[in-house]
Amino acid sequence: MAKRVLIVDDDPAQRRILEGCIKRFGLESKTAASGDQALHILTGPEKDDIALVLLDLVMPGTGGMAVLEQLRGRPGSPPVIVQTAHGSIDGAISAIRAGAIDFVVKPASPERLEVSINSALKLQALSGEITR
C-alpha cells in the first residue's frame, strides 16, 4: 500500500492542488476540510493509514495549532508539516515547538513540498527503526 498523506485545509482549491502534487510524488492522499475532521481521522480507525499530515495553520473552528497541541506526545502520531499564507518567523517557531516537523509558506512550490515530504517520511522511518 502506498503511503497516505492527510491534507488538512479549509480551502477546497488548495486541497485539490495539494492532492495533485501528492499523486505526482507517488503517494496517496486523504483530505480533511477542518481541524476537527483531521482529529477524527487521526484518532479513529484510519489513523494507522496516515503516514504524514500536511496541515493548514489558519482555519475556522479548530485551527492547525490546536490540532498540533492535541497530537503532541500521542504515540504513533504521524509527522506534521504545517503550511500557512502567513509566513512569520514567530508562527514557524510556534508550530515547530508544538510538534511540527517542518513549516512551508503558501503557495509552496511542488519541489519544496516534495523535499519536505520526503525528508519527513525518511525521518519517520528512521525513528521507527530506532524504537524497534
What spans do the regions from the language model cover?
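Short amphipathic alpha-helix used as the core "switch/output" element in two-component signaling
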Residues: 40-43, 65-76, 94
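C-terminal output helix
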Residues: 88-90, 104-118
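Acidic, metal-coordinating helix/loop segments flanking the phosphotransfer/catalytic sites
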Residues: 31-52
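The feature encodes the CheY-like receiver
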Residues: 15, 60, 84, 88
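Acidic catalytic/metal-coordinating carboxylates
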Residues: 34-37, 62-66
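Active-site residues of response regulator receiver
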Residues: 9, 56, 84
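Charged docking surfaces used in two-component/phosphorelay signaling
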Residues: 16-24
